[in-house]
């Protein structure tokens, strides 16, 4: 049993809304593998429910086992109990920035006698 992990950005093209007994829910359909250049193989897409906090434009990682289900002449692939996580991408292209402020309020060093120290 293989686990497939796919990262994609939720957008109008790959996300749809369906009505369920618990209200409207979003479903994302993501390619399960990349198509090789020049290949005539059709890419299979897997679908998963998105948590309510995922919005269009968010980048998500969907991971889980995929199950095939025949529906007439088509085969639908669905993630079974997937893990869906939002990927946090910073808009800052630079490396981690160091704190530029003085964390100690700009105070001068204090001289302490060694007799006053507890150790």
From Swiss-Prot:
Q: Name one GO molecular function term.
A: DNA binding
Q: Per the record, a Pfam family?
A: Phage_SSB
Question: Quick one: where's region Disordered?
Answer: 96-119
Tell me the domain of life: Viruses
What keywords are assigned to this protein?
DNA-binding, Early protein
Cross-referenced InterPro entries, in alphabetical order? Answer: Lacto_phage_SSB_sf (IPR038621), Phage_SSB (IPR031900)
Instruction: Write out the similarity annotation.
Output: Belongs to the skunalikevirus SSB protein family.
| Assembly behavior | Homodimer; two homodimers can further weakly assemble into a homotetramer.
What the protein does comes down to: Binds ssDNA with nanomolar affinity but no sequence specificity.
Please identify the protein, giving its name as recorded: SSB protein
Q: Which organism is it from?
A: Lactococcus phage SK1
Which lineage ranks, top first, belong to the organism behind this chain? Viruses, Duplodnaviria, Heunggongvirae, Uroviricota, Caudoviricetes
């Amino acid at each position: 049993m293989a686990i497939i992990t796919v990262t994609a950005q939720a957008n109008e093209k790959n996300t749809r809304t369906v009505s369920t007994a618990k209200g409207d829910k979003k479903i994302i359909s993501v390619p399960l593998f990349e198509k090789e250049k020049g290949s005539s193989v059709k890419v299979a897409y897997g679908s998963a429910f998105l948590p309510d906090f995922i919005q269009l434009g968010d980048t998500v990682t969907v991971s889980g086992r995929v199950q095939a289900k025949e529906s007439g002449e088509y085969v639908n692939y669905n993630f079974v109990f997937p893990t869906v996580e939002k990927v946090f991408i910073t808009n800052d292209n630079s490396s981690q920035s160091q704190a530029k402020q003085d964390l100690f309020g700009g105070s001068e060093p204090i001289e302490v006698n060694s007799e006053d120290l507890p150790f």
